[in-house]
Amino acid sequence: MINSLLTRVFGSRNERQLRQLNRLVTQINALEPTIEKLSDAELQAKTPEFKQRLAAGESLDKILPEAFAVCREASRRVLGMRHYDVQLIGGMVLHLGKIAEMRTGEGKTLVATLPVYLNALQGEGVHVVTVNDYLARRDAAQMGKLYNWLGLSVGVVYPGMPHSDKREAYGADITYGTNNEFGFDYLRDNMALSRADRYQRNLHYAIVDEVDSILIDEARTPLIISGPADESPELYIRVNRIVPQLTRQESEEGEGDFWIDEKGKQVHLSEAGMGHAEELLLQAGILENAEDGLYAAQNLSVVHHLNAALRAHAIYQRDVDYIVRDGEVVIVDEFTGRTLSGRRWSDGLHQAVEAKEGVPVQRENQTLASITFQNLFRMYKKLSGMTGTADTEAYEFQSIYGLEVVVIPTNRPTVRKDHPDQVFLNRKGKFNAVLADIEDCAKRGQPVLVGTTSIETSEMLSEHLRKAGVKHEVLNAKQHEREATIVANAGQPGAVTIATNMAGRGTDIVLGGSLESEYHALGEDASEDARFKIKTEWQRRHDAVKAAGGLHIIGTERHESRRIDNQLRGRAGRQGDPGSSRFYLSLEDNLMRIFASDWVQKAMRMMGMKEDDVIEDRLVSRQIEKAQRKVEAHNFDIRKNLLDFDDVNNDQRKVIYAQRDELLDAESVKDNVDGIRGDVIYDLVARFVPPNSVDEQWDLKGLEATLESELGMTLSLTDMVRAQEEIDAEQIAAKVQTAVDAHFAEKEAAIGADTMRALEKHVMLTVLDQGWKEHLAKMDYLRQGIYLRGYAQKQPKQEYKKEAFELFSEMLENVKREVINLLARVRIRSEEEVAELEEQERLQAQARLMASQFQHQDVGGYGAEEEVEQMQGGNAPVPVSQVTRDEPKVGRNDPCPCGSGKKYKHCHGQLS
């Protein structure tokens, strides 16, 4: 009550921020008359002037009003577009490192030019992040005219571009690209074997377009670079033949072999199902011993394959979750409806789906490098974003990324009419009503956009409309090549467009059709008369559509997130245009069936409802919203859980990547090698001759054999001990150390100091990369089974942290030992041989990258649902990580970032 009273008196926090920013808008507008009088040359000269002022110590905030005024005037001259006052506010919000919520059609692309121009003046690079390559290239081409005119360079990065071009794009003042490309390039850079092979500079400032889609929807899935593992895909094909013989239970307690947990996208074998599966696997010769049972240690790989095959058959549907194209299984993005070519599900799921569809089964992949979007974007010194729908996820933006959401007012009031949901008993009744609404709109000349959640639904509706003789277009993963043309015409009078999840399409639907597309089709040489005719005809259509009610949005199903529904609605009513929306639902829809309360269904049936009867009631709408909130909370838990685990990996990733950077930058790593050699020899001797021990405890023969097998050195320690009457363990260790040092000195004298330095650096990098790759595989296995610790009354997250630390320490020790062993045994005659070795390794690394899969991991892996429940059950709350604005270098005497409490040099800085 006190809060609401204070809000009434002082306004909400959002209103107070807008008032504060309006003062800066007044300053910018006051500068406009002066800036307008400048010639083109004088306006362009402002860019070097701003750079000089920044170099002299002036802050970005100080020059903001003048820089925004210059950018606005340049935009008016170059693009023919002048920023509105609300767009200036949006630009300020982005500059301040916050999220600007701006409605569809309010010109987010133009808004971004203001903070991009201002921050690019620092010369450290600005990344503009989009959801797809088309938008990245389009925006770079359109807005690049403005930036180039103002004296700033622009680059765009996309998959498959030549190495030199990509380096140049990252070296530009402003770089456009997708979130995936920026993420994969970061991982590629940290697999590079020389500075020349790297693309990116420091991560300075990023503006993320459709920020909710990238930082929330896609944050459930890590970016992974993986290479083919050695295991044959044959087992997937054999297990696939067995799964169709298993039957589904209708309920958890019913008859059958397995039941489906639809919320968690999991399949669970029943008691009877385990027995039936074992029987079938024995008959097929996949299980060898009937006594061992399915869950014996040696059969865990079979369990993994069986679970993947069950999920592929029971949960993942063709033309909903994936399509089959040119003999390949291609994933369909559940949020945007786009195909994700080149991406693969992990945990064997993709191979299981390939086996199910009868297409060639690719080898399972081994992780080479991975990162989540949360940890990628938190590495930027400054991060901001824009979207039409962020306010519903404000808590997550604040708690995970430290980003505040500011809702920007529209330039003109929104007049769209959002009609209440209509709820039907079944899908047939719902689609009859949808088809009737579409036909009514088409007759009246009102354009209609129909949003569906799957390709299957869009094609079913298309078939019904074709039979009814209604002309229409379908926009889904199968027709994405024609996307621009379809969207350009979606606002024509009476146009009917069926689209799977319009979220993130990035192109406005203009009432009357796209005038810009018609001008483009005319060509640049078209006469003014021809352009005038086009404009007159477009205006007639535009007015006719407005009179018919503007664009009408039909939603055929509620999405699991309210935000996606709002994005669909937001396609209508842009910039004060008229428009309307309505959602048609049925009790058979996934959201209603899985999450809505049973009483809604019972009540509708008790009322004797028929399939064409409809309910429009606030109580039902509230139940639907409640169901959506449940799903949103569930998905937040999954993302938070993923982040808690990846934070452990991230601490280790930072240490490894920091050490790689030091190795790449170092002229010489001799001091590192000398230090490592001392540690390795001390540990080696201590295994056979423990410190402070007596000669009866020594194993000199074992030490001699190990020195020969691991270091290629022959030392007669037994004779040496016989020759000296009094010798202790410390003296033996010193003798071995001296002998090994001499062995390395001889090698260096033989091949030359420069050759030795190059060899040391090459070996350290290669061994570190191999060790990290093997460590990631171990971490994957640890992650998959850690939730089971919850059944032993242990906290899985704490257990994961503890074991991950032990694995990491073990990996570092193995790396140190392998470096010394290789350097001791390798035979090199000249520096040219080292250079040739490095070049071969570099080419092999590039070949591995070319053969690698770039994927989003499917987080609904075996046991993922149990993981979330186990992580939450009885665990102390984990402190929420705030956005890291700057990553200082870890000093040798600083506390290690892994949290052990030791100094960095005594913990994970041991390689440095």
From Swiss-Prot:
It is found in: Cell inner membrane; Cytoplasm. ATP binds at Q87, G105, E106, G107, K108, T109, D508. Its main location: membrane. Keywords: ATP-binding, Cell inner membrane, Cell membrane, Cytoplasm, Membrane, Metal-binding, Nucleotide-binding, Protein transport, Translocase, Translocation, Transport, Zinc. It is a peripheral membrane protein. Zn(2+) binds at C896, C898, C907, H908. Its cofactor is Zn(2+). Its EC number is 7.4.2.8. Residues 864-912 are annotated as: Disordered. It catalyses: ATP + H2O + cellular proteinSide 1 = ADP + phosphate + cellular proteinSide 2. May bind 1 zinc ion per subunit. GO terms for biological process: intracellular protein transmembrane transport; protein import; protein targeting; protein transport by the Sec complex. Residues 902-912 have a biased composition (Basic residues). It comes from the Bacteria. InterPro entries: Helicase_ATP-bd, Helicase_C-like, P-loop_NTPase, SEC_C_motif, SecA, SecA_CS, SecA_DEAD, SecA_motor_DEAD. GO terms for molecular function: ATP binding; metal ion binding; protein-exporting ATPase activity. HAMAP family: SecA (MF_01382). Part of the Sec protein translocase complex. Interacts with the SecYEG preprotein conducting channel. Has a central role in coupling the hydrolysis of ATP to the transfer of proteins into and across the cell membrane, serving both as a receptor for the preprotein-SecB complex and as an ATP-driven molecular motor driving the stepwise translocation of polypeptide chains across the membrane. Monomer and homodimer. Part of the essential Sec protein translocation apparatus which comprises SecA, SecYEG and auxiliary proteins SecDF-YajC and YidC. Belongs to the SecA family. This is Protein translocase subunit SecA. It comes from Xanthomonas euvesicatoria pv. vesicatoria (strain 85-10). The lineage of its organism: Bacteria, Pseudomonadati, Pseudomonadota, Gammaproteobacteria, Lysobacterales. The gene is secA.
